[in-house]
Amino acid sequence: DRPKALGDIRGVSYVYPLMWRFGVLRVPEIVEKNMSLTLEFGFFRDLKEAETMNQLMRTTPEEMGLHSQNILNLLERLEKENISVVSMMLLRHNQVLYKAYWPPYTQEQLRTVYSLSKTFTAMAIGIAAGEGKIRLDERIVDLFPEQAKNAPDSPQLQMLTIRHLLMMSTGQGNEPFHQENAWDDAISAFLREPFADAPGETFRYNTGATYMLSAALKQRGIDLEEYLRDKLLTPMGITGTRWIRDPNGICTGGFGFSLH
């Protein structure tokens, strides 16, 4: 009995910045409109507090004191500017006001989250640290002694820790994976990269640093994807995942994660 509308609108994956830009975030309300998308308004008033995403209570914008016209304006603006949207879900006070998937995308499809993969990797490190399986002050050369033997020795490399990888403050001057054939042995490629600063001094975006977090977990016998699935995703009701792996079977960490 949930009202649905099908349509053919084009939109954006990063909707929230657009909502801010268009002034909609001040009043995030929803509308059911016969456009090029599938809308789902739920009416589960009697659900207890949700334990997973699939159990979140559904409601209507007006029941939360909001005006649907604001979201209608956003959808029309997205269509007018020919901006591609894959899906959108809005919540207020832990209740779903609006949920939509733009054809041909559906809720069942795995979607690649690109560099948001880094956030999931960092969460896995946090969980592992909380369980005592890894320490933030552990030195990288101690985690990878064999590869470190063949890397150019430097004071910076000796200082480098898990914490520096998390902060993207490795001190390396460039992205390590620009090297030819780097993915044949990505750990060694990372350790070979020259330093420009001492670790902890300067932030530089570094996908290789997040890969090394995944590799560090692997050194402890922990597969990143399986660990996240067990500790975080399955308890949240997220059951479908896939992560790109390097030739040695290590999840890429900084990219390549897909989930429902």
Residue ranges and their predicted role:
Residues 72-106, 136:
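A short, well-structured edge-of-sheet supersecondary motif
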